[in-house]
Amino acid sequence: MQIPTAIAASLITSLATTAAQAHAFLDHANPLVGSTVAAAPHELSLSFTQNLEPSFSSVEVTGPDGARVDAGKPQISGNTMRVGLKAAGPGTYHVHWHALSVDTHTTQGSFTFHVGGQ
């Protein structure tokens, strides 16, 4: 019995989409991606679409002068990664994250947020 080409293509596309959805992508962050906040936050929180593997997931935050302001290793619980931040004053903060989901696929990304009236 032969499977028609359209059905086979649909099945392959469906499987590929399911596999891509299994990765841990950033769902939301606090402070929000691209936002401006009045004062430097004491903590950064990242929530992902899948649970994370704590030993292989990380985040690095640099302040307006380019120096790291993340305060040590992030705390990871389920799909949430949190790290304390050292205040570095007004300006643009850069966040770069790397996540390994429990399905062993890695993702990474970066974004900025602003402190003060910029």
Model-identified regions with their sequence ranges:
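Short, exposed beta-strand-loop hairpins at the edges of beta-sheets
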Residues: L85, H96-S110
